[in-house]
Swiss-Prot record:
Catalytic activity: tRNA(Glu) + L-glutamate + ATP = L-glutamyl-tRNA(Glu) + AMP + diphosphate
Name of the protein in its database record: Glutamate--tRNA ligase
PANTHER family from the UniProt entry: GLUTAMATE--TRNA LIGASE, GLUTAMATE--TRNA LIGASE, MITOCHONDRIAL-RELATED
Motif ('HIGH' region): 9-19
Lineage start: Bacteria, Pseudomonadati, Pseudomonadota, Gammaproteobacteria, Alteromonadales
Residues where ATP binds: K239
SUPFAM superfamilies on file: An anticodon-binding domain of class I aminoacyl-tRNA synthetases (SSF48163), Nucleotidylyl transferase (SSF52374)
HAMAP family xref list: Glu_tRNA_synth_type1
UniProt-recorded Gene Ontology molecular function terms: ATP binding; glutamate-tRNA ligase activity; tRNA binding; zinc ion binding
Intracellular or extracellular location(s): Cytoplasm
Amino acid sequence: MTLTTRFAPSPTGYLHVGGARTALYSWLYAKKNGGDFILRIEDTDLERSTQASVDAIMDGMNWLNLEWTHGPYFQTERFDRYNEAIEQLIASGNAYRCYSTSEEVDAMREEAKAKGEIEKYNGLWRDRTDHPADKPFVIRFKNPLEGDVIIKDMVKGDIAISNGQLDDLIIARSDGTPTYNLTVVVDDWDMKVSHVVRGDDHVSNTPKQINILRALGADVPQYAHIPMILGDDGKRLSKRHGAVGVMQYRDDGFLPEALLNYLVRLGWSHGDQEIFSREEMIELFDLKDCNRAPSGFNTDKLIWVNQHYMKTMDPAYVAEHLAWHMADQGINTENGPALADVVRIQADRVKTLKEMADISRYFYEDFTELDAKAVKKHLRPVVKEPMILVKEKLAALTDWSPEPIHAAINDTAVELELGMGKVGMPLRVAATGGGNSPSLDITLALLDQSKVIERIEQALVVVEARIAAG
């Protein structure tokens, strides 16, 4: 039988980092074992499910390049199948109609609480046949009363739950729509899911689902419940901690490889290794090596991983992602250096691609004003002579590349008996609009020669104005 995993998000919001990690672990385990990975959209909550959320989930999966073998399947397209399963359970005596109102069930729970017993439905309609003809009803699963359910969890080890602790859960609402614990069981059965990887907040559902699977005569998959992700305050990660949807990390300038690498280490490790290629993840990952304790989300660590990938990946590939940020910031890159060249000189100067796009604007756009602090510090009256001379030397170059450019700047400094900084810094402000840039000769080489001369002339106008102002 083919090993099969699945990722089954509910489209009630964006794809968050916890869901993305679950998807990654499921995808990796299937890949490692030559299996199938299913994408299933659990959209039976008709009031909260939205197409926008479906789109956000799909966008996130595609951006992370977690390709699925089968799907996406939508639960709303399978109601007939769920009804078949419900009828099967009723026919086999494993489910029944319950006519108790919600108020009556609440009273049952309160009574149990007062007696110090487990708060659950008391099974009033479990074996009754005197069904009223004019009252609404739900369908409940007839949970076994004796014995234990053993979850053989690949992460947590064996977990035993007494059937006496479990409720006769509702598997169909009064309007006939199936509930989560029924639909997920039928889907996993029909789709031949062999390994269920999900967050440990689902542990409480697992014994109920195992009992339903057995009542249907279905195989029980192996389970792996991975621990939750915590914020820096030790509480479950949420928006309050800065947790955002996967696509927000794209928008903020992170590479998908960086986010995947960071997520795989949130709950799994291989010695002290921090950086993993996709191929290494597939080769080394094993659910049995996942931690049992929760992991803490650290944005600074994610930034460090992102910087590593920006600096070490093929600049042409990084440039493909940088292009999105350039367009997002309204920067037209048709006229200017190749983005891969920009990546080569900027990658070790920034934390994110968004930042890289922002500081690289001067390669593609003329600026209407210079940085005020840089002007005050570097475009003083004394720089007029070196600016004029370096402009002449740069204009005379027939080879517009870093080495001749560097020689022109150096010759200007030597000729006027100045330090390189006395020539280079005013030139940097003139060419880039500010006081920070990569190596000046390389920066100028990526700019058009005539553009550099034009910008020096504009900077000289500023210098002349300062001279005139005294």
